[in-house]
Amino acid sequence: MNIHSFAFLRRGFVAAEAYAKPFFDENFMHRMYSCSKSVVSLAVGKLVKEKRIRLTDKICDYFPEYTDENTDESIKNITIEDMLEMSVPPLTDAYALRPDLPWTESFFKVKGVKPSGTIFDYNSSSTFILGVLVEKLVGKTFIDYLRPEFDKIGVGENVYCVLSPDGHAWGGSGVVCTMRDFIKICLLVAERGKHDGEILLPEDYLARATSKRVSNYTRNDYAPRKSEGYGYQFWITDKGYSAYGMGSQYAFFFPDKDLLFVCTGDTQVAADDFCGEFLYEWVSDVYDEVTDKKLDEGDDYENLKRKTDEFSLPDFCGVKQTPFAEEINGEKYILRANEMGIKWFRVWLNNDDGFFEYENARGVKRLNFGLCGYKQGKFPETNFYSRRVGIPSGIEQDCIVAAEWTEEKKLLIRAYVIGSNFGNVFITLGFKGDEVGVAMNKKAEFFMDDYEGFAYGCLSAES
């Protein structure tokens, strides 16, 4: 599994902490994806504490500019609590249902398929609007609104949130911070809003937020980490509660043993449910072994330290070299018209590294890779968004890339973008005589769209 970092904490103290170095360390700013939702919940709790809102308030009352006589009745009935509990009427995210509208407006322009507050149905648009509500009431993003509390618990000043296309903090997915920053936020949650004897966030709100408010067991896919209920932007587990983010951003809370597990990663190439189940079972095994007995500073301690020091990205299943490699080294392959828009490519190979050279609609590109080892560099595109969805960053983003021969004549290139948003593309090149098959499989939200599909190619007559 492509896990970038993890930590176990007991009674607020770090018991184990590891990073997949040299690419990730304690200062790496990591996209937290839907763990962002739990942070938005804290901001809503602060609004409640300051009596700026009531959970029974109708969200439409705060956005009259988007509602009129045509607004669906089920949308008019949505309360703030319904949104926190993921029990709103639309079938899916409003910005997906109405891509023709700004994200904020779209929430109020869709039709409901069920009464508000009746059925759990995961909906990121709800959280996004809650974040916009914070901005509307206090004139700052939910991150900046929580800055006084963050300062007291030691969360870094450089924490930020990616913006939506219409310029609001993307509370459903956009928080970017270090793992240690997120740990500090989680510890505040675990302590029900208290820090050094001071009440920073309302205890009663956090008690409700981290306990079952609504049943989310609505499909034949029970899992102890996610099917025991849902709170206010927190998942209820069989042993406590949790925060989840796409790609294996997780925080598992075990209150009875005062145990916390946090990790970051990019497992978007795999089914997130599978990775989540595997991680939760692994962490649950650790939970079962946790006692009050102190670990001796002997073999056990040294073994733990060695394992955390040696923690790295997953090993490779292929090989570094094959006899066939030299036959295609530097040769040009011309591709038929394809959905990626790639006209031709070459693979250049050395002993330990190489690069994939190709031309698409934006020009000639060069993707450097290590052979059976990751190489850090820049992904050769400037049209990916960074701080705001849909707005090209204009810069090449950081990436790590590796290649391996999975068969004698089949080369797999794995590229992971590790900027303010995470994405990956697996490029498979299968050679047969003078022909080549190309497959690109990407997993990235709102970018890398033309890095997916198949292509048919032949060795160039120039070769």
Label the predicted regions.
Residues 50-89, 109, 138-173, 177:
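Active-site helix/loop module of the DD-peptidase/beta-lactamase fold
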Residues 12, 30-56, 83, 130-134, ...:
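Active-site SXXK
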Residues 206-264:
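Active-site Gly/Thr loop motif
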Residues 25, 111-116, 126-129, 164-171, ...:
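Flexible glycine/proline-enriched surface loops and loop-helix/loop-strand junctions
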Residues 1-24, 258-261:
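A short, well-structured edge-of-sheet supersecondary motif
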Residues 129-133, 171-194, 249-266:
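Active-site-proximal alpha-helical segments within enzyme catalytic domains
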Residues 245-315:
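Structured C-terminal helix/loop/strand segments within mature extracytoplasmic catalytic/sensor domains
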Residues 298-463:
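Peripheral terminal and inter-domain segments
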